[in-house]
């Protein structure tokens, strides 16, 4: 109860109220033994700018649930956002060691390595993640994007394609089709990009971002009428 109340207050921007709910929650036996409430409280303090308190709360959560993949992931990604890259890598690596079958921790570590320019290390972790869960389309997408940013266009194409074929009709495939379409449009392969954007909206018609990206490409090609048609389809979806 206290956890739910705290989360609702936090989502409404009532930080002090949320903090008090979390504080009351951990005074109960159930709350003290709940990794989720410690994690939520840690995230609150982190967003409030109290780094020391956030770290203490993450640590208390791990004392309750040492293998909690959610805490290792949340703590590691938070440290990365603050710029404490080495600390983030250490936390994510520990989380991976304790949860060797979790692709999300591997993906987070892979993305961090890619952002730091160590593409070989990133590839190792991305590959491990796809072996663990070949159906995890977000991992294929993240890997493809990392290769694209590094200028490895053919590798990126291959990864987008592999990710799509995991399940072309799953809503997550729309992100792969969309990103792949943007890549092809920037490479000048407009016909292919159109087909990919069409596939993306067929999978996820509610995504305004995909429709507008497609319309913008048509505008850039000088086809204003087609761009208007696509925007109209977006508004009628």
What label would you give each PLM region?
Residues 1-237:
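Alpha-helical solenoid scaffolds in eukaryotic macromolecular assemblies
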């Amino acid at each position: 109860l206290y956890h739910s109340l705290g989360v609702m207050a936090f989502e409404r921007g009532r930080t002090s109220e949320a903090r008090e709910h979390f504080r009351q929650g951990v005074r109960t036996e159930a709350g003290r033994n709940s990794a989720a409430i410690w994690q939520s409280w840690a995230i609150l303090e982190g967003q409030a700018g109290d780094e020391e308190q956030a770290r203490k709360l993450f640590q208390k959560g791990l004392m309750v649930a040492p293998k909690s993949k959610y805490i290792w992931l949340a703590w590691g990604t938070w440290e990365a956002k603050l710029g404490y890259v080495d600390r983030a890598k250490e936390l994510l690596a520990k989380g991976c060691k304790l949860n060797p079958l979790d692709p999300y921790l591997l993906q987070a570590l892979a993305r961090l390595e890619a952002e730091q320019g160590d593409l070989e290390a990133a590839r190792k972790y991305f590959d491990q993640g796809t072996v663990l869960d070949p159906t995890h389309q977000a991992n294929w997408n993240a890997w493809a994007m990392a290769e694209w940013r590094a200028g490895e266009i053919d590798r990126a194409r291959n990864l987008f394609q592999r990710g799509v074929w995991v399940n072309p009709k799953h809503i997550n495939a729309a992100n792969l089709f969309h990103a792949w379409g943007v890549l092809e449009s920037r490479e000048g392969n407009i016909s292919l990009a159109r087909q990919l954007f069409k596939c993306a909206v067929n999978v996820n018609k509610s995504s305004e971002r995909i429709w507008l990206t497609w319309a913008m490409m048509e505008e850039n090609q000088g086809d204003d009428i087609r761009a208007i048609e696509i925007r109209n389809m977006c508004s009628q979806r």
